[in-house]
Amino acid sequence: MYSFEDIKVFDPELADSITMEIARQNDHIELIASENFVSKAVMAAMGSPLTNKYAEGYPGKRYYGGCEFVDIAENLAIERAKKLFGCTYANVQPHSGAQANMAVFFALLQPGDTVMGMNLAHGGHLTHGSPVNFSGSYFNIVPYGVDDNGFIDYEEVEKIAKECKPKLIVAGASAYARKIDFKRFREIADLVGAYLMVDMAHIAGLVAAGYHQSPIPYAHVTTTTTHKTLRGPRGGMILSSEEFAEEHKLNKSIFPGTQGGPLMHVIAAKAICFKEALDDSFKDYAGKIISNAGALANELTARGFNLVSGGTDNHLMLIDLQNMNITGKEAEHILDEANITCNKNTVPNDPASPFVTSGIRLGTPAITTRGFNEKDMAVVAEAISLVVKDVDKNKEQAKALVKMLTDAYPLY
């Protein structure tokens, strides 16, 4: 197991950067929707000697010797993932959600095939068809988006699907604050003879806890990350039925298709994460993520902020700042000066460039892990409001509110 003291002795420059990052995490309110704080057990697994072991292949079928013990770790992760999400197949080797998505695309499609995915500018993800990503480079992408109220228009999705006849429809998002109807997506996919892939990276923890409709009964294949609302190590995973996975060789699409050796220390951390999520306490945690998000959304609305779709059903919200006469880039910067961390984000029909944006995305998974409750959301909203409306006048007052909360809820 690693010791931070060893790092300080051998590489004080790097140790300084880690120390400063620990301080930042402790002293800032973390509102990036895709970030969370892992448990000490998850962190310990990632710093374990399992990082030393090469294990190309799968449990019982490795290309290296000496894998009998890392096989135990991977099998634990697989069985726990299947139990957690109620499926018969799980591949826990993807290094990221993006690589899980890539593996599924290459397993089900040929270059040039048509794919429908949510428009990145409307809340989708790079890997759902952005032209700068592999998905937009190798495949013919037909995007769908949200209506003028910020909701997915399923009738419009069906209309587009009938017109373009995709081979694959991707459901899921990175900046969509409402529940997604996976059953409706499957009906549309069946109507046009398409596969349905659900990327539940952002909502996996909410699905596991029963607070969002599970895609497992409806999707041909589901991908996810293991961090975000699931609160595990940074990594990816593919879920499906054993029959579909075998027919389409999903395992081979990960190894040797898109990856070499798996990261056994991360897979061990995934196993711990899944065990944590199977505990009854995780359901309570996920419920608090949603209640905190709802409370924060209400408090921000009361202070004049414009929320895309008017609110949230999950862990995140998208704030359109055009009525505040400030860009997303500017808001991200000045909030960071007040020790509030968030990210700039495009809003539907955004007139600004993706490097500037007209909005910010906020999420509650990390602050909920820390212990923040619904009453605290009024303080968080007030700090945000003070900074966005007049940073020069109000920054110190906002920082004092932030310090009051971070002192009340120490991180580690």
From Swiss-Prot:
E.C. number: 2.1.2.1
Alphabetical list of Pfam families matching this protein: SHMT
Compartment annotation: Cytoplasm
Disulfide bonding pattern of the chain: none
Top EC group: transferase
Pathway assigned in UniProt: One-carbon metabolism; tetrahydrofolate interconversion; Amino-acid biosynthesis; glycine biosynthesis; glycine from L-serine: step 1/1
Record function comment: Catalyzes the reversible interconversion of serine and glycine with tetrahydrofolate (THF) serving as the one-carbon carrier. This reaction serves as the major source of one-carbon groups required for the biosynthesis of purines, thymidylate, methionine, and other important biomolecules. Also exhibits THF-independent aldolase activity toward beta-hydroxyamino acids, producing glycine and aldehydes, via a retro-aldol mechanism.
Protein name from the UniProt record: Serine hydroxymethyltransferase
